[in-house]
Curated annotation (Swiss-Prot):
Role: Repair polymerase. Involved in gap-filling in DNA nonhomologous end joining (NHEJ) required for double-strand break repair. Seems to conduct DNA synthesis in a stepwise distributive fashion rather than in a processive fashion as for other DNA polymerases. Preferentially acts upon short gaps formed by the alignment of linear duplexes with complementary single-strand ends. Required for filling gaps that need removal of a 5'- or 3'-terminal mismatch, however lacks nuclease activities.
Region (Involved in ssDNA binding): 360-369
Protein name: DNA polymerase IV
Residues given in the record as Mg(2+) binding sites: D367, D369, D502
Protein's UniProt keywords contain Repressor: no
Catalytically driven reaction(s): DNA(n) + a 2'-deoxyribonucleoside 5'-triphosphate = DNA(n+1) + diphosphate
Example GO BP: base-excision repair
Source organism of the structure: Saccharomyces cerevisiae (strain ATCC 204508 / S288c) (Baker's yeast)
Chain intervals with Basic and acidic residues compositional bias: 135-155
Annotated gene: POL4
């Protein structure tokens, strides 16, 4: 297939990694890439084809999220621009059409492939994915999913296209419904369900800032102690509900629908399958989806360079199911005790403690975060060597099953396992890589670990999880490794799951600031750092500073005092922290 004499333009953002990848494909076929939006509209460019990112096109081939499209494309008026596109007769198709052209070795598209610029109406699903917590009004990003046009005639169309509101509130049998019989405020639960979906949608698509806006709005709704009756009421009475989100809330309450929410459900599922694998981020997942890869098996055959570049994906694939299973607090504590026992034999003075969601009182944890420190030791290189020695011992003892970051010493110990995974995956080309370790000295260690059968039996005999302060709402069942990908599976068949374990370290003098940082949550850390900045301070994991002068780093409570804050226990740094500090 030759594309010589063909012109293509990428919108709204030609500089994303996936678009750069597609640009290189087209250029190799002889195509010319139009870099300027204005060039698209010149009479001499009538033959240009505009390629629009799939995330801006719904299942009915309508352009959606025009406000976001306008911002990312750097346009002053998106409607005026689209009008000129239509007048000039320029054809617009989805970026994923490139995959079809390459596979068929033919440049051709049908009328059904052309993008329309009128919005479509989509019903809110009654199946809400779980999201998390909250944002400041002033930092809210416009996150409109629906069309800018919300007149009465459009609302009538939306009502006709929707399921009955009662149906939305009841939910499907076997699925988590938006509202339960115990719910006091039904409007709120309906809104929360939609915000969860929006949060998850943008998380999966790698849109961190938009996801954060919805998380924070969702948290405000969860903390709300009255039944929200309008978007305006939510905007004026609740934090983190800006005009954009208030507008959506009003549409939800009026009609039970939110245009654009479900148009990418299929895409979300495909991206989620890849993103749930350790080592795979949004960009890789999007690229593989655009190339029509539906399994790791296909990706390994057609894009082996990605696995060679980041070999940890092989272990994310191998332990896919295990690493999606959460563990009890008792199991976290059992892992801590095992590490502490081994550590005493290496350096009795060095100490280690649990951080993360365990420290915040969660009943279930996705992984284990351990913080290492040593009284009066401010040499993190010394701590790094202690952790490396500990890792070597625990690997030889059979506790560590895989490393996800290497030093030269760990590479010598573990390289055979990496090679074995490449061979099992039938990936070639790894022999050309000369070095597998990331650095001579690393101060963070990531790994997969397993308890012994005896420890697992002892764990089963424990009755209650001590220290549980927060029981999360049930999430939907996570994805499972597809049958075509099972040949790489090292997942447990006896219930003894491989667990993700992370080692961190901090200087003795920075212990207080380090504990704040590694306890989390991410939203709490962001909030307290913004608050510190507003008061003229700078807070990091290394301490509290003013004018680059360290004020406090060791005493955690003193840091709160200097910020004029009441000390927040770790369990108060979860989703309810904002309500307590408002």
């Amino acid at each position: 297939m030759s594309l010589k004499g063909k012109f293509f333009a990428f919108l709204p953002n030609p500089n994303t990694s996936s678009n750069k990848f597609f640009k290189s494909i087209l250029e190799k076929k002889g195509a010319t890439i139009v870099s300027s939006i204005q060039n698209c509209l010149q009479s001499s460019r009538k033959e240009v084809v505009i390629l629009i990112e799939d995330s801006f096109v719904d299942s009915d081939m309508h352009l959606t999220q025009k406000d976001i499209f306008q911002r990312e494309a750097g346009l002053n008026d998106v409607d005026e621009f689209l009008g000129k596109i239509e007048q000039s007769g320029i054809q617009c198709v989805k970026t994923s059409c490139i995959t079809k052209w390459v596979q068929n070795d033919k440049f051709a598209f049908q009328k059904d492939d052309l993008i329309k610029f009128q919005p479509s109406i989509i019903v809110i699903s009654d199946n809400a994915d779980d999201g998390q917590s909250s944002t400041d009004k002033e930092s809210e990003i416009s996150t409109d999913v629906e069309s800018e046009r919300n007149d009465d005639s459009n609302n009538k169309d939306m009502i006709q296209a929707s399921k009955p509101l009662k149906r939305l509130l009841q939910g499907d049998k076997g699925r988590a419904s938006l509202v339960t019989d115990k719910t006091k405020y039904k409007n709120n639960e309906l809104i929360i369900g939609a915000l969860k979906r929006l949060t998850k949608k943008y998380e999966i698509e790698g849109e961190k800032f938009r996801a954060r806006s919805y998380r924070l709005a969702k948290q405000s709704m969860e903390n709300c102690d009255f039944n929200v009756r309008s978007g305006e009421e939510a905007h004026t009475k609740l934090r983190n509900i800006g005009p954009s989100i208030a507008k959506k809330i009003q549409v939800i309450l009026d009609t039970g629908v939110l245009p654009g929410l479900n148009d990418s459900v299929g895409l979300e599922d495909k991206l989620k399958y890849f993103k749930n694998c350790y080592g795979i981020g949004s960009e890789i997942a999007k690229r593989w989806n655009l190339l029509n890869f539906e399994s790791f098996c296909v990706a390994a055959k057609k894009d082996p360079e990605e696995f060679v570049s980041d070999w940890t994906i092989l272990f994310g694939w191998s332990y896919y199911d295990d690493w999606l299973c959460k563990m009890s607090r008792n199991e976290c504590f059992t892992h801590l005790k095992k590490v502490q026992k081994a550590l005493r034999g290496i350096d009795p003075e060095c100490q280690v403690e649990l951080q993360g969601s365990y420290n915040r009182g969660y009943s279930k944890c996705g992984d284990i975060d351990l913080l290492f420190f040593k009284p009066f030791c401010n040499d993190t290189t010394e701590l790094a060597k202690i952790m490396e020695t500990l890792c070597i011992k625990l690997y030889k003892d059979g506790y560590i099953h895989c490393f996800l970051q290497l030093t030269p010493n760990l590479e010598k110990l573990f390289l055979k396992r990496i090679v074995e995974r490449f061979r099992t995956a039938k990936i070639v080309g790894y022999g050309e890589r000369k070095r597998w370790y990331s650095s001579e000295i690393i101060k963070k260690f990531f790994m997969g670990v397993k308890l012994s059968p005896r420890e697992l039996e002892e764990l089963k005999e424990m009755k209650n999880d001590e220290g549980t302060l927060l029981i999360e709402e049930e999430e939907e069942e996570e994805t499972k490794l597809k049958p075509i990908d099972q040949y790489m599976s090292l997942n447990a068949k006896d219930g003894n799951y491989c667990r993700r374990l992370d080692f961190f370290c901090c200087k003795w003098d920075e212990l207080g600031a380090g504990r704040i940082h590694y306890t989390g949550s991410k939203e709490y850390n962001r909030w307290i750092r913004i608050l510190a900045a507003q008061k003229g301070f700078k807070l990091t994991q290394h301490g509290l500073f003013r004018n680059n002068i360290l004020l406090e780093s060791f005493n955690e409570r003193r840091i709160f005092e200097l910020l004029n804050l009441k000390y927040a226990e770790p369990e108060h740094r979860n989703i309810e922290w904002e309500k307590k500090t408002a």
